[in-house]
Design a protein with these regions (language model features):
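Conserved Walker B catalytic segment
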Residues: 112-131, 142
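Conserved alpha-helical scaffold flanking the Walker A/P-loop in AAA+ ATPase domains
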Residues: 16-21, 85-106, 114, 121-125
Length: 328
């Protein structure tokens, strides 16, 4: 690869800014953008280029960093819904250590907008007193009032929602035909990871159609509701299979790197934790996709007159409320 940024989808302005920053980087960067915009991928790509800069074997450092297995790349991520005291302590300890190999250490803090007061305080402390060899890359979906001071210590990098055409183009580079790429991009909720996962799932469009037809499948009887719910929940459960296959491939690739560089268990525990979180998130994403499909069908019904505008509007409000509750 020419550089790690070549794998980033869209975000040309952010990529250009970070690529220019590799030679003489600022002390800390805060990447802010919507969920699905590729925040983690861009942050890891930037870290990979920082660690590969002016090294004798840059491709090895780049490859290790992109696999999130470089000894001088610490990724701080939560295991649960928010950061715990133990994670704040690991950040404190890492903030003052020296690089293992080379003259740069990168600390990547993911989803800083989900940090509690203890973690925010620890982050501020390490940001204000870092050794010159340590660089910070933070990601957030929003800059909350609690993050105002942290944001003031960082160079801001804003990401936009991924354009549908960028998603279509990316899926085509992965070997997906244009018609399927466009159909998947339209139901992926502007999420790169979601689009790639759905593209590998042969039943994805079938699930979308079943959700879209849910309103017409219900005839007012409890039996119809039970049948529809059972079938849709079965499809949601089956949707995890493509993700599990991808996760197996990621573990195999990491093990190959570990064998190549003589590091047993290289980053494996962290990857397994992330995999568990991805599986939990998948169910939420599937239900949100279903709500979107149902909402689109209701909107079409209001437009063509098959659904009363007043009752249809109430249904849409209820769907939006449920979706917002699910996202929390």
């Amino acid at each position: 690869m020419t550089d790690a940024f070549s794998q980033v989808v869209g975000q040309s302005a952010a990529v250009s800014m970070l690529r220019n920053a590799v030679v003489n980087p600022a002390h800390a960067y805060l990447l802010n953008g919507p969920d699905g915009s590729g925040l983690r991928n861009l942050a890891v790509s930037f870290a990979a280029e920082l660690l590969a800069h002016e090294r004798e074997n840059p491709e090895d450092h780049r490859r290790l960093a992109l696999a999130e297995a470089h000894p001088d790349l610490l990724i701080v991520e939560r295991e649960g819904l928010e950061y715990r005291a133990e994670e704040a302590e690991s950040l404190r300890d890492a903030g003052y250590r020296s690089p293992f190999d080379g003259d740069r250490q990168i600390i990547l803090i993911e989803d800083i907008h989900l940090a509690n007061a203890v973690f925010v305080g620890m982050t501020l402390k390490v940001l204000e007193e870092p050794p010159p060899s340590t660089y910070f890359v933070l990601t957030a979906n929003e800059i909350t009032p609690a993050l105002a001071t942290i944001a003031s210590r960082c160079t801001p990098v804003d990401l936009a929602a991924v354009d549908t055409e960028d998603l279509v183009e990316h899926l085509q580079t992965l070997g997906v035909d244009e018609d399927r790429s466009r159909a998947i991009a339209n139901i992926a909720d502007a999420s790169i990871d979601r689009a790639v996962l759905l593209a590998s799932d042969s039943a994805a469009l079938e699930r979308w159609e079943m959700w879209s037809q849910l309103r017409t499948d219900l005839d007012g009887t409890g039996a119809a509701v039970t049948l529809a719910v059972d079938r849709l929940l079965q499809l949601v459960d089956e949707s995890a299979e493509p993700l599990r296959k991808r996760q197996e491939q990621e573990l195999e690739a990491l093990d190959e790197l570990a064998e190549r560089y003589g590091e047993r268990g290289l980053g494996r525990s962290k990857l397994e934790i992330r995999h568990k979180r991805e599986l939990r998130r998948l169910r939420t994403d599937e239900l949100l996709m279903g709500m979107t499909a149902v909402g689109n069908a209701i909107s079409e019904g209001i437009t063509n007159g098959s659904i009363d505008a007043s009752s249809g509007s109430r249904s849409l409000v209820s769907l939006n409320t449920a979706a917002n509750d699910l996202r929390r």
